[in-house]
């Protein structure tokens, strides 16, 4: 089983959109103490590419950041995320905390991805075929797509950082 990641999302008008999203009232018996104001990420996908000349392989422009996509269960935050999408609400910050198993066998936060001035650009609802026995352990899911002005990466364990801000001419902050 993959180790979890948790995300908190703050909107300019809505405030902490993920407040209470990972509680028993919101997700039933799958909640976990200590992460009440976050969503559990079921899957993650993000792609950054550099355009390049097909002949020489040399870069021809700045990096292209495709939407960052998280898959989550339908929870208390779902209506608020949909409202933020349809209103075009600015997401002031979206923070993903990544966990791994430590040498002591415990979950430890080791990596953080932070989006600033983000926007939810798409939400896809998903439900696996409920009569397929192979899918019976799945629940209702949604994929949330984020575009952003700035992204930062922080390896908390190794104390290394990186970032990209499209307002910065060089792309570094």
Segments (PLM) and residue ranges:
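Glycine-rich, low-complexity intrinsically disordered segments
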Residues: 1-173
